[in-house]
Amino acid sequence: MTLPLHQQAIVADAHNDLLMAVAARPHEQWAEFFRRQWLPQLRAGGVRLQVLPVFIDDEFRPEGALRQTLRMIECAHVIAEGNPDAVRLCSTGAEIDAALADGLIALVLALESMPGLDASVELISTVHRLGVRIASIAHWGRTPLADGSGEDATGSGLTSDGVAALAEMERLGIIFDISHLGATGVAHVLELATKPVMATHSSARALRDHHRNLTDEQLRAVAATGGIICVNFFHAFLSETKATFDDLLDHFEHIAAVAGIDHVGIGADFVREVMLDLTPPWCCEGDANSRGVDPFGYVEGLEGPAGLPLVTEGLLKRGLAEDDVLKIMGGNMHRFFKERLG
């Protein structure tokens, strides 16, 4: 049973790689497959605002990265155009509000790293015209713009092209995402940024010492920009052993205590559901596992979006005030997007 408070919430998730699963199908099937496979899960979880990252797997890099980037952006547009009674692709805060008022799920496009753009900073305006409103500049490893998570030993910040990319994103109104950026790169961005940034799917390094998580100093610095940190549900980033639901709640509470309750959101990263949907499972072969990460692991009950009411319930049981739970479940992200996207 869904809690009344969960039904009141503008449940928002800053990271669901469902585009990978949908775009793996022939384009004629995109709208129908989303409606059949993913829409019921989003509705069951009460999701009202969903960020759709465009992630390009190694199979497409480097030669096919731009084509796959455009293909996945097109996939998001086809999903929205083919399901006008259920979802709407939004590029401004006003459009998000209109979608919510119409009872639709608001979708926002993001780029998770930019392998398709490489160092061509001028192409950032192109993807902005296509609807991208959030972007990061690195994933695992090194890019022409910055070193990603796991490359902290290099001590490298943003390259000159990376600095130009940050400036161009701020000019255009694209939100800079620091998730997956190396530690020195995060510090560099926070030094240069003149507008609020976000971490779309990162948890607390104080609780799980993993390079994908943020230190308390980084959490406070993101909050100081006016930004938001969206907690990642992925099991390997929550605990060194098998992650539990309580581990996840600990990360929410820790980030709220360090960054402030107005700077916490959800960036669930339901990897397992995406992996199970992929046909063929090209993204599961070697890539994630070679980095010591099991893409099929998950927190019990949170295999996919349908489990999100459990988070509302869990936060309430931890003693958080209802208003604070509503902020975490999506109120903060909704406010942040309205402020940043206009």
Regions found by a protein language model. Name each.
Residues 115-118, 129-212:
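Divalent metal-binding pocket/active-site signature
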